[in-house]
Amino acid sequence: MKHEHLNLLAAMSLALAGMPMAAWAQPGTGKSVATAGIDTAEASRVTQTVDSRVTSTLQRTHLAIVDKATATKAVDDASPMNHMNLILQRSAKRQAALDALIAAQHDPSSSKFRQWLTPEQFGEAFGVTDADIAAVSAWLKSQGFTVNGVYANKMQIDFSGNAGQVRQAFHTQMNHYTINSASHVANASDISVPRALQSVVVGVAGLNDVRPQAQHTKPTYGRFNAGTQRFEVPQPKVAAMAPTPQAVNFTNGARGLVPYDMAKMYGTDKLYANGLTGAGITIALVEDNSMVPGDWSNFVSQFGLTSYGGTFTQLQPQATGFTNCIDPTIAAPGEDDFEALLDAEWSTAMAPGANIWLASCSDSNANNFFGGVFTAATNLINGTNRPNIISASYGYGEGFSDAASKTAIDLMWAQADAEGISVFVSSGDSGSNPSFNGFIINGVGVDANAFGTSPNDTVVGGTDTADILDGTTKKYFSSTFNAVYGSALSYVPEIPWNQSCGNEVAAKSLGYATSLAFCKAYLNFDPNGYYITSEAGSGGPSSVDAKPAWQRLVHNAAKDQSRDVPDVALFGGSYGGSTWVIVCSYYYPCTPGFTGPTALIGGTSLSSPMFAGIQALIDQGLAAKGLPASQGNAAPTLYALAMDEYGGSKGNPPATLAACNADNGAKGTGKCVFHNVTRGSIATQCVQQLPNVVTPDCYFYGALPNSWLGPIQVGLTTTNASKYNASTEAYAARPGWSFASGLGSVDANNLLTAWKAFVNVQ
């Protein structure tokens, strides 16, 4: 069932109508300006004797995918299960009060505008009562668990035990399963709790280890050719087996974009010239791995960013009274995690003066759904030292999450929003289902990133530069690098990032009338299915969270009741591997002139930290005008500004809808806040392995009896499996908002100007 969120963008007037002391959440600091006048007083909801013999089942507290898998064996009762989180349920009264407060915090006309909470104030007003927490904690201890502590938000109890205790207390068996060819641990059925506790407990986050994937492409390594100003990238061995129709002329190699290029494309160069670099703003990147700090220094030096004064800190965040974040130590100097590298280097690329925190916790210390990433994020949000901005480049579809894990994510981002933290999340890297990064959609239908479908974060999708497929590279890029290896001349037209034959722009560039015709022809070139892919920016509707009011009001907003993603998009990758960004790593350092092999990479794991960097520039610009630097969730303001530029959900759109079309490039878009991406789609290939796998939301156009996956049917993702066209493909770009690219990309300089006007400062 969808949770009804009342996050009305109030600025749009029509829309606003018995444990150790250290283990407990810290005491509240009293009423703040934000909570003044809000009635959240309530009595304990645990009013009956807690009897473990009288239980109630909590729905959706096991993974649905487990029902399709066969258990290989039971988990041994003595197997430890550390740092599980019991997720609590706030009352309807407090939920409504929180929704109203967050709306007011984003309303420039409200006395509560930008009046942010501390974690303690949040817990005092919107958490579960101390009496109810004591009742739940006492029951956990009676079952033999160790209660490690209660978070300041009074919504999470961290506890540890073993599989036998979980079976006995929650009436579910922990098993080993093989899911998507990987070994996992998960509970076999929904859990049960004493009926007396049912009203205050959602479930347990930590009963499975199906964790999300980092949303980046596999790194490619190229050698720089000074003659072509491109990187020569080795072709896969399978390419020699048959010619591929993806062989578009990519001008003798791959292009490696650098910070200068992104600054030109997205207008941050103008902000740098005015002294706005992100100085004084902190961006936290939540990770489950680490990197070599010297690689960040290498990146900053290579691309001329040192003088801006940004800083880099690698840390393990701990909430007050907790020690559950363990350092994911690098075993050897060269064992960089490319997710960490990409996030750290490219958030700095956009905000070269910002303070970058790489906040990482090891997965090995927790069984919970999002492992170290979840621990890092929730510890930051409940900690003493909090960032202005968080970027999370991880994801999995909602179909791969359980109710407790999804609720934990949503309450975490709502708390961040109420505290003023802006959260950005990658949409995913596999088209209409974000769970297949680096693989092919198989056995499931349309889905959305569970880590991003909260209405309290901003989801960032992926785009591709259109110049190569359009044959307009000379118009937008210089033929030679400048001193910092940049070549972009201006904004470059964008299309959705899509590396499959479902890319209509690529199909037409290759002479096909439609992507479907291209895909059918493709089968003749690829009888073994080596080039079948679902790699693309992701987007789709939530099956859990309801659409917030601010998302309904922009032109072409989906006419559904779901929280839809993405919200915005920035460069993520390229068709045919023609364009990537450069990262500097221990084994592949960046050298003057790129004399050695260089790492090239992409994904929405690039897009999210880049937008976080842009937000840092916005924050600094607003702080310079006397406003709080922290802005909370960016999405409500972004949609309000988009409504001005694209028009509302009713009536004729303004002339700026056409004027701000990304296809116009730099011509006529100089005053636009958004670049509206209107060509292409994120519809990708999907497969159905015969005879046992059923893949919904897939229009099948052919079969490969001898593919490397065995006999398969091959199709394109769609919202109607019986037909495939511009209306049914999942999903097409279009004017206004779309599942393919949200509101599009931004001009950061114009965004700051419009944001200032929105909050009534000059």
Which sequence ranges carry the predicted segments?
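Gram-negative bacterial Sec-dependent N-terminal signal peptides
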Residues: 1-25
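Substrate-binding/charge-relay-adjacent region of secreted/lumenal peptidase catalytic domains
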Residues: 26-150, 158, 163-460, 509-510, ...
